[in-house]
Amino acid sequence: MKVAFIINDLQSMDLKKDTSIFLAKEAFDRGYEVHTFNTNNLSVQEERLTAQTSKLTFPTKDQLSFNLSDNGTEDLSEFTHVINRVNPPFNKDYLYMTLLLDAYGVPCINPTKALREINEKLSILKFPEIIPSTRVTASLQTIKDMFNQGFESLVIKPLDGMGGRSIFLVHKDDKNLAVIWETITGRGKHLVIVQEYIPEAESGDNRIVIINGELLEQKLVRVPSPLDFRGNLAAGATSKVEKVTNDDKKIAQHILPFLKEHNIYFAGADILGGKLSELNITSPTCLQEINNASDINPSEVFWDGLGDS
């Protein structure tokens, strides 16, 4: 099997946590030919979509350290799978990349059409019965109205962020509300998502993982640091692995038809207090953490589901 990973920040990865390298290592150990390229390496030549790729090899059996070697130009139609691991926020080059991959029928995980059309913050609006009270707005008054309706605390997020970046927790009568609104919306120029604060977040944000339509039996619980409300590892949260609960399974059953409809092979869902807060399909993470603290190897589950075609 010949596979490629689209990764824009390969050299800056944290090998102890990175999911992309974890998946690539398993592919290499299975004898697959593993390549990598970034969004700027694409070209259309003589009716072919090509990329300047590097071969990815792992010299040590039990470590994720890797070697890169320039490989030259590859026709992307020759790859069995192309794994898109580009992190948000996205720019026009990312959009053009997805359009090219679609136009030339390159087999991508997850499908580029889904990545282009499904926003991770907005997609939860399809499941109103299982999400926190949520608004999408650029209006300061709409945020104030939520407080007037009885909410004591709100979380405000950009629509294109990741890793807890630029997320604000605001409280009723917060004197910083206006300046937070100015900062995150550009004085009303950009839409944001506003959600009721879930107090159970203090005990941890639950990341469940769905691969090939199946929920992993273990989840990652990310507990915020005492100095930060965000349950993101990139924001200093700590983590532990636990068995998924019946509530987790119910939420998975709610979103599975949506994932199948859009041919989404690999997804992560974030759950707070029994409610779905985000649905990550762009570049889901946390596989290494689950692998290291349980008897489940998610990278094996990932590649087993794709077979050896």
Give the location of each predicted region.
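Short, well-ordered coil/turn residues at beta-beta hairpins
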Residues: 6, 84-86, 158
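Conserved N-proximal alpha/beta basic substrate-recognition cap immediately N-terminal to
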Residues: 11-12, 17-136
